[in-house]
């Protein structure tokens, strides 16, 4: 809670370059508070009144002590990217379309699980394409998806997110339009088999028992069985069955090697893991994109298709070029150059102009993207 008549630091409204809602030192009026509520600004940095107290009536301001500068604190720095995204008109439009898609997916899953032998693929695809088109740039897409985590049921939001990410990958691969659309639906339907898993197992807050984990691992087969007889592209069916297979044969349910795994399933596997790792889990906070890139770099090239994974990681890392980040020692800096051989460890520049190559200074790493 805040009260009027205090000073504050920058408050941004998310636009392509960021629009300032209020400059540092602006008096915090009731009108401004209401404006920030409208833009869903979750927190602000408040100046200590001793730094910028208003002059009293009749006071000779010329003789007044020079106002001390407002110290730039971590609170000032961390007007978070989440707040900037959620403050935007674009986000509110995206949010409405996202919820429309979620309802469409929920309805589709319900009908398929009830035994219906067809679904309105065209309407579902149109809704997802409309949502995808409203995102703009790649970074805006990832920003928007991150901010939708708590809006809908985790299963349906995950399926939608994976559909959107697979769609981006398909376009990066310069696939034919019809193939991109099929890949999108494959991403959306990939986890439909989880509808057959009891909620108390699927959403269990504690560690799963061996029996429960074995049941979870059956969801690809459950999903394939649900859509086997639908009049849809066979690649969608294989994606539901194979998205947990891995190129080295370590996946499930059939321990297939790379020669037997459908390309759409391999693309969906990458999107699936990325979305899962950047989501909060009961045992950890959501990982930042560079932590996910690091994880893929350390073990991903034996498990995932190298062509698809390299493309995804390069595009993802490039998305954050010039972005402001925080290191594990709480210092803030900007990414100035990517290391092509280790994308998770770019070269960064601090506010004093000094440069740090994270690939050669391995005690430091990117902890969060601002």
Please name every model-derived segment.
Residues 162, 182-197, 214-310, 318-320, ...:
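Alpha-helical scaffolding flanking metal-ion-dependent phosphate/phosphodiester catalytic sites
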Residues 331-340:
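Short beta-strand-centered aromatic/proline hotspots
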Residues 343-355:
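Basic/aromatic-rich interaction segments and small domains that mediate binding to polyanionic partners
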Residues 69-214, 227-230:
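Acidic/His-rich, divalent-metal-binding segments that scaffold phosphate/diphosphate chemistry
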Residues 1-8, 12:
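Single conserved hydrophobic/aromatic residue that forms the stacking wall/gate
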Residues 354-370:
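Glycine- and charge-enriched low-complexity intrinsically disordered segments
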């Amino acid at each position: 809670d805040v009260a009027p008549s205090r000073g504050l630091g920058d408050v941004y409204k998310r636009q392509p370059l960021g629009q300032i809602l209020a400059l540092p030192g602006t008096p915090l009026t009731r009108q401004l508070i209401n404006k920030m509520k409208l833009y869903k600004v979750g927190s602000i940095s408040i100046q200590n009144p001793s730094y910028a107290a208003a002059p009293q009536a009749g006071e000779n301001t010329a003789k007044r002590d020079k106002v001390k500068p407002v110290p730039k604190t971590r609170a000032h720095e961390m007007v978070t990217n989440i707040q900037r995204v959620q403050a935007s008109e674009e986000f509110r439009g995206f949010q409405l379309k996202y919820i429309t898609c979620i309802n469409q997916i929920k309805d589709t899953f319900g009908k398929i699980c009830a035994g219906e032998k067809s679904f309105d693929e065209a309407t579902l695809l149109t809704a997802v394409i409309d949502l995808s088109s409203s995102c703009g740039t790649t970074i805006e897409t990832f920003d928007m998806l991150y901010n939708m985590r708590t809006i809908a049921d985790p299963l349906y939001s995950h399926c939608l997110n994976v559909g959107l990410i697979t769609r981006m990958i398909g376009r990066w691969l310069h696939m034919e339009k019809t193939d991109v659309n099929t890949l999108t639906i494959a991403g959306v339907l990939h986890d439909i088999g989880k509808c057959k898993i009891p909620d108390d197992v699927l959403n269990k807050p504690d560690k799963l028992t061996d029996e429960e984990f074995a049941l979870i691992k059956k969801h690809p087969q459950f999903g394939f069985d649900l859509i086997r007889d639908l009049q849809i592209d066979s690649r969608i069916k294989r994606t539901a069955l194979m998205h947990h297979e891995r190129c080295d044969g370590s996946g499930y349910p059939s321990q297939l090697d790379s020669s037997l795994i459908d390309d759409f399933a391999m693309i969906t596997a990458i999107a699936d893991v990325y979305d899962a790792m950047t989501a909060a889990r009961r045992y950890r906070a959501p990982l930042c994109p560079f932590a996910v890139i690091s994880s893929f770099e350390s073990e991903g090239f034996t498990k995932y298709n190298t062509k698809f994974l390299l493309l995804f990681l390069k595009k993802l890392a490039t998305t954050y070029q010039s972005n402001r980040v925080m290191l594990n020692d709480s210092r803030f800096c900007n990414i100035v150059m990517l290391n092509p051989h280790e994308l998770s460890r770019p070269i960064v520049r601090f506010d004093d102009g000094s440069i740090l190559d994270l690939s050669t200074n391995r005690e430091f790493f990117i902890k969060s993207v601002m």
